[in-house]
Amino acid sequence: MQIITNTLDTYTYHELADILHSYNNTAAVSDFLFFDIETTGFSARNSMCYLIGCVSLNNENFIIKQFFADNPSDCDDEKKMLTEFMHFASGFKYIVHFNGDVFDIPYLKERMYINGLPEHQFPESIDLFKKSKSLSLLFKLENYKQKTIEHFLGINRSDKSDGGELINVYKQYLTGKTLGKNVTSEYNMLLLHNHDDVCNLPFICHVLSYNQIWNEETYKSTSFSITDGYAFNNNPVKEITFSITLPCCVPKDVSYGNDLFYIKLSKNLLKLRTKIHECELKYFYTDYKNYYYLPDEDYAIHKSISSFVDKSRRIPAKA
């Protein structure tokens, strides 16, 4: 087992801080660990985890660590890798991943059990797949796979491989290493795929910035305007548009509308437009039998003061 560590310069501290603070404005960037795993199959009982990639902040530098089970002669290689990873992950408050609630975390827990390791408590989970899927009305994507989200956000990757294709590459790597062959190509291919998967997670975190629209406590300023519009029957109506300034920008404009309202989010400006319905506001008394209705004045009064009104000008209130 080996641990490969490199410094990243692909994102700035302040950019990522603004996005993560939109999720939790009291957390520090150093509280978050981004991770992704590579396995030889989907079933934890019939396969193994051979690579775990992590990105984190260390002294204002972003670091990628890749825990790689690369020793074919060591039957405890995966066990050592899992132990090192869990020790490292225990120092963080949040663990960020893509669909890890369904696959990565349950898979690792099962592999730890199979390898005879004690049960470990993972940091608080942030699943970017779930966060993206919850915004499907705004994003309107054909699916919510990681590469689809990356394309939507304008994220480019060097790796063109599929995780499933790399299973054979890993097997070729182990076989070649055992036979003393040059396996540099396979080694680089395995690390590159995991590198791009995990290094793109902070960029995918931009989806968290769209959740600002539900948190009115973060609104920096709010204004509104009233204009003329038309209902579906072409009758003129008034429309009200709220303009709300948000704390950080979103990477891509989105919008959604239906019969009741229209919403558009562009950079850090949220606009919500809806029709103003003009009608008579009514209040229903639960104890209406204790009231009289005054037809001439068109309002109700309690029986306790009805003695001051002529009987001809009042009638018992009805439900």
For each predicted feature, which ranges?
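Short beta-strand scaffold segments in enzyme catalytic cores
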Residues: 52-54
